[in-house]
């Protein structure tokens, strides 16, 4: 994502060469990537893409990682057939491109996916995880849908509004200390609002020395210095889901 006040490139980082363990399906008007859990525990997680789209191998890798921990996962195409952002594209037109892909206007898609998970996957407990653009979506959805048992927003831009604290269920926020997209003052604002007003469990973690995209767009072996932070963030994500689902 780019900061809305100061659009800047969102580095695609390391694009994984990853085939995936799941399959593509059609859910009403949406294409989606689904991975069934090896253990049918009646739990599912919606994984929400970043600006590079639902087919980015890195996002599917994360969905498969979550699935391996006991959850059926689904990565829907929340752009609904519109092209994802091309990392080699002209960043001067990014703000206009983004206007047609509003992370807070995906209710029709969420309704279809929830129906699919309940009817076709027999999910009784559902959570959500989102990266970048998807992190914004998670924050929005956790303030709107009480049926999401747990949410994890990974470096989603903090939108300043009076109700950013109004979470309905436990939510984990993961940020990077050196994120040029999300200034630490925005993280401090969110921290303050939640501390003053939030009535459910939440946690905000900011990872030292890390940059935007570190959780899902860096290979685990890319740097000995980064690997512990990547591992910890991914572990925290799974632990949060396990605790509240």
Curated annotation (Swiss-Prot):
EC number: 3.1.-.-
SUPFAM superfamilies: alpha/beta-Hydrolases
Modified residues (Phosphoserine): 223
Positions bearing N-acetylalanine: 2
Subcellular location: Cytoplasm, Cytosol
One term under GO cellular component: cytosol
Disulfide bridge map: none
Active site positions, chain numbering: 132, 179, 212
Any one GO molecular function term: hydrolase activity
Keyword terms of this UniProt record: Acetylation, Cytoplasm, Hydrolase, Phosphoprotein
UniProt keyword Phosphoprotein, yes or no: yes
Record-linked InterPro entries: AB_hydrolase_fold, CMBL, Dienelactn_hydro
Keyword Hydrolase attributed: yes
Gene3D superfamilies the record matches: alpha/beta hydrolase
Main location: cytoplasm
In-chain residues carrying the UniProt-annotated modification N6-acetyllysine: 36
Protein task: Cysteine hydrolase.
Family affiliation: Belongs to the dienelactone hydrolase family.
PANTHER family, A to Z: CARBOXYMETHYLENEBUTENOLIDASE HOMOLOG
Protein name (database record): Carboxymethylenebutenolidase homolog
Name of the coding gene: CMBL
